[in-house]
Amino acid sequence: MWCYRGGSISTEPRINDRIRVPEVRLVGPSGEQVGIVPLAKALELAQEYDLDLVEVAASARPPVCKLMDYGKFKYESAMKAREARKNQAHTVIKEMKLRPKIDPHDYDTKKGHVVRFLKQGDKVKITIMFRGREQSRPELGYRLLQRLATDVEDLGFVESSPKQDGRNMIMVLGPHKKKTEAMAEAREAQAARKAEAKANPGRSQNAADEDIPEGELPEGEVPEAETTEAAEAPAEASTEA
C-alpha cells in the first residue's frame, strides 16, 4: 500500500467494475489476443467464462486487460514470492581470506574449509589480501585463485571471476547442486548401512566378505607392510626430535 496525503492507494490492479475506461485491449484466458473491444463486451466475456477482467497494463492506450481467475492468480503470486524469499534466505555466502604468498600447510587448511562449505551447499567468497609491494604483483592473486578453483572444481564452479577490489582480489565459488545433493544421499546411505551393520553384525560381515574378490583387501585396510611402515614413522620422528 502506498500512503499519500494521509490516504492510501492500493497497488493491486483494477478488476471488473473498478475498470473505468471505454475500451480495452483484451487478452483471453490462454493468453490469446482478442483485440480492442468495448469495456462492456470484455465484462460480458468475463461473465461467460466465469472469470475476472483484470487490468494488467494500466499505462497502455487502451489499457490491457486479461480474463483470469484473480483469486487463483493472487494465491500463486503469493506462493512464488514466498518461495523466492525462502530461497534467498537460505543462500549463505561464506568467506575465506588468503595471502598471495600463503605457505602450503595454510593453503591446504584453507582449501579444506572451502571444500566443507561447498559440500554444505554454501557459496564461498575467496579474498586475496595484498600488502605493501604485493599490490604490484596482482598475478600472484590470479594464480592462487585459479589454483584453488581447479582444486575444488569437482565440488564448485567459479560464479564470479577474479577481480580487483581495492587492495584485495575476490572470487566467488558456487556449489554444484547436483553433486552436493548426491553426496548428501551417499552420506545418508552410508549411515543406513552402518545402522544395519550395528543391528546385524554377523550377517553384515558375511555379506561384506562375499563381495570382496579373492586376493583383495576390504576397503579401508592396507597391506601389513604399509601398516608397519606407518607405525614406525612416528618413532623415527620422535627420535629426531
UniProtKB/Swiss-Prot annotation:
It holds the Pfam family IF3_N. GO terms for cellular component: cytosol; membrane. GO terms for molecular function: ribosome binding; translation initiation factor activity. GO terms for biological process: ribosome disassembly. Gene3D superfamilies: Translation initiation factor 3 (IF-3), C-terminal domain, Translation initiation factor 3 (IF-3), N-terminal domain. Residues 208-229 have a biased composition (Acidic residues). Residues 180-197 have a biased composition (Basic and acidic residues). Residues 230-241 have a biased composition (Low complexity). Keywords: Cytoplasm, Initiation factor, Protein biosynthesis. Residues 178-241 are annotated as: Disordered. It is found in: Cytoplasm. InterPro entries: T_IF-3_C_sf, T_IF-3_N_sf, Translation_initiation_fac_3, Translation_initiation_fac_3_C, Translation_initiation_fac_3_N. Belongs to the IF-3 family. IF-3 binds to the 30S ribosomal subunit and shifts the equilibrium between 70S ribosomes and their 50S and 30S subunits in favor of the free subunits, thus enhancing the availability of 30S subunits on which protein synthesis initiation begins. Monomer. PANTHER family: TRANSLATION INITIATION FACTOR IF-3, TRANSLATION INITIATION FACTOR IF-3, MITOCHONDRIAL. This is Translation initiation factor IF-3. The gene is infC.
